[in-house]
Amino acid sequence: MLIAGPTASGKSALALRLAQMHGGVVINTDSMQMYRDLRIITARPTPEEEALVPHRLYGTVDAAVNFSAGAFVEAAAGALAEARASGLLPIFIGGTGLYFKALTRGLSLVPPVPAEIRDAVRLRLDRDGVAALHAELARHDPAAAERLAPADRSRIARALEVVLATGRPLADWHGEASPPLLPPDGVTAVFLAPEREALYARIDARFAAMLRAGALDEVAALAERRLDPLLPAMKAHGVPALIRHLRGEISLDEAAVIGAADTRHYAKRQFTWFRHQLPEFRWVTPEEAGRVVDQEFQGNPSCTTSTASS
């Protein structure tokens, strides 16, 4: 069972209900909820929720780690094998489209980039700026330079690292994929699609609630580690704005406005990405999701605990 959707769409509640009803294990498919440093700001399930049914891959990665899609697939394979061995229904839930695509389409086989090349590229990025790196990328991989936004620091650095390390453009590697862990025709996949304005209001309310729950203290503890700002955990929605507040650059109210706005923009991108990249997912509203999923369970024998290994 795959449950995707934008942030704050009600995925966790649906997954918890299904796991309780059908003997399932909830497997995280959200890149930011992997990080143990970020329980509050990423809206991870609470300890009380995690105690109700088995949860896997939540808070298992240190913020200093640049956790890749390949590492996720490896971890997901272990969680899936454990679920099947225990006779539990695996329920993959999250909002990271690349993770779902890797699960159902396979993963491009990009070789690891040597540390010395990665460090050299990051050093030049900090020293010379993103425009210089974009110009260098245009010489080595014109197609990538044309495709990427000139200010997209992370993706420009990644594309340059790969072409320097392998001699091949990143797009070439993306054309070669490993076999999928979950073939699309063997899973039930839904995308929760709330009404936009209601979703955005929920995002704003949730960000305010996270601040009341201690998100600022959580981010302060992360900032004290002085990690590379390009690491994924350091770019989680709300983290950069709250760090700016902690540095005295903006007020807490301004940080809250920026953090909520960044999250709304991300939700909008999630709608677009899933519509174009994973059209096989069935789009449902949160209100109809329970009924639709129950119908899928009744009509699909693989959606049962007794055949969870199929």
UniProtKB/Swiss-Prot annotation:
List of residues binding substrate: T7, A8, S9, G10, K11, S12
Pfam families, per the entry: IPPT
Root EC class: transferase
Signal peptide: none
InterPro entries documented for this protein: Dimethylallyltransferase, IPT, P-loop_NTPase
Superkingdom of origin organism: Bacteria
Presence of the UniProt keyword Transferase in the record: yes
GO molecular function, one term: tRNA dimethylallyltransferase activity
Gene Ontology biological process: tRNA modification
TM regions (residue ranges): none
Listed cofactors: Mg(2+)
Keyword annotations of the record: ATP-binding, Magnesium, Nucleotide-binding, Transferase, tRNA processing
Annotated positions for site Interaction with substrate tRNA: T96, R118
Catalytic activity: adenosine(37) in tRNA + dimethylallyl diphosphate = N(6)-dimethylallyladenosine(37) in tRNA + diphosphate
UniProt entry tagged with the keyword Zinc-finger: no
Family: Belongs to the IPP transferase family.
Job description of the protein: Catalyzes the transfer of a dimethylallyl group onto the adenine at position 37 in tRNAs that read codons beginning with uridine, leading to the formation of N6-(dimethylallyl)adenosine (i(6)A).
Listed name of the protein: tRNA dimethylallyltransferase
